[in-house]
């Protein structure tokens, strides 16, 4: 069955999701988008992308529609989600990717207006369930869960790596740092911002800031609740990030044993979400990689029962591919 999707917020994640649908061949049809930007600009930004390159097909727009190839879909510009009638366009699932409606009590408006399910492309509040594909997606219950969070890109990287280690060695506690590409909420030049570190010019600074990824791990791996914490270092690249995780585990081990356990998980239960590599890669090598986490075996360090590992991730493309997977998964039980 084709899953019909509406996208609220056609920014970086909204457009990456659209491209990922096309690239994956998933049985998903985008029937409408809602964004306050004019349609001509939206079409241009979909057609030309500084990271992904030119869209492989014709893209055009009118005042009411965007056309990609031979497929047209509605484009609305409603500030208030309450004015969106998703039932009129037949949307089964709405991707909430504006960044403004991360509280499920607000995002639920999409369901009130005709969508069967709502997926928030960010960490959320009051959601029915937070899902990281490959880690806890089997907890999804179509009867109970209407508003779902896809967690953050960093949690999607951290969780598979942590699960692989915890399942074999039992994580006691740990700290993580995400070396993260700059994002749209930072400044190009120094200027006012609620976070005074993020107020500084993104392209010429390493910017320490907060991340909720480590604490959020307890939402998808309850046995690790309260056992991880960390922060982010935003760096001057537009995409391509890395999560550095250091944990104490239940027994002494070796780097070889840790790598073997992660490799087994990447080839087994976490295949497609966790990828294992022994190549000496850098961040640009994983741009457009669809995996949630690319485990870098060459960076594994072990001292007794202390384990340090690194996983790369394309914080836009990898995350958007998980949205495609989640839509497909949820769509099976509509």
Q: At which residue positions do the language-model features occur?
A:
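Acidic, glycine-rich segments within the central catalytic cores of soluble metabolic enzymes
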Residues: 167, 171-238
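Short, solvent-exposed beta-strand edge segments and adjacent coil->beta transition regions
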Residues: 144-145, 201-203, 240-244, 306-308
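C-terminal active-site/capping subdomain that shapes the small-molecule cofactor and substrate pocket
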Residues: 230, 242, 246-334
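Alpha-helical scaffold segments in soluble metabolic enzymes
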Residues: 12, 16, 20, 44, ...
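Hydrophobic alpha-helical scaffolding
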Residues: 151-152, 206-208, 248, 313
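Short clusters of hydrophobic/aromatic residues that line enzyme substrate/ligand-binding pockets
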Residues: 66, 131-133, 147, 188-189, ...
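N-terminal Rossmann-like NAD(P) cofactor-binding subdomain of oxidoreductases
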Residues: 1-199, 301, 325, 333-334
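Generic secondary-structure signature for well-ordered alpha-helical cores
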Residues: 22-26, 163-171, 181-184, 211, ...
């Amino acid at each position: 069955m084709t899953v019909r999707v509406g996208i609220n917020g056609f920014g970086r994640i909204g457009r990456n999701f659209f491209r990922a649908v096309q690239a994956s061949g998933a049985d998903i049809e985008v029937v409408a988008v809602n964004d306050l930007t004019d349609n001509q600009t939206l079409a241009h930004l979909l057609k030309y992308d500084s990271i992904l390159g030119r869209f492989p097909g014709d893209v055009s727009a009118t005042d009411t529609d965007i056309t990609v190839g031979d497929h047209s879909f509605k484009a609305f510009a409603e500030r208030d989600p309450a004015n969106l009638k998703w039932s009129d366009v037949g949307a089964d699932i709405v991707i909430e990717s504006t960044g403004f409606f991360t509280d499920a009590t607000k995002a639920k408006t999409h369901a009130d207006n005709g969508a069967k399910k709502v997926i928030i492309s960010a960490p959320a509040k009051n959601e029915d369930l937070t899902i990281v594909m490959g880690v806890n997606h089997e907890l999804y219950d179509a009867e109970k869960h209407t508003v779902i969070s896809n967690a953050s890109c960093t949690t999607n990287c951290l969780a598979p790596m942590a699960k692989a280690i915890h399942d074999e060695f039992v994580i006691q506690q740990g700290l993580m740092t995400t070396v993260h590409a700059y994002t749209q909420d930072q400044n190009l030049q120094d200027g006012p911002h609620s976070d005074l570190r993020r107020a500084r010019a993104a392209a010429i600074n390493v910017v320490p800031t907060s991340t909720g990824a480590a604490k959020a791990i307890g939402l998808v791996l309850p046995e690790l609740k309260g056992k991880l914490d960390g922060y982010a270092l935003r760096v001057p690249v537009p995409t391509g990030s890395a999560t550095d995780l250091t944990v104490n585990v239940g027994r002494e081990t070796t780097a070889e044993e840790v790598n073997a356990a992660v490799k087994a998980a990447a080839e087994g239960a976490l295949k497609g979400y966790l990828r294992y590599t022994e190549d000496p890669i850098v961040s640009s090598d994983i741009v457009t990689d669809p995996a949630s986490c690319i485990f870098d075996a060459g960076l594994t360090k072990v001292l007794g029962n202390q384990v340090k590992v690194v996983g790369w991730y394309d914080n836009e493309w990898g995350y958007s591919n998980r949205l495609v997977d989640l839509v497909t998964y949820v769509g099976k039980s509509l």
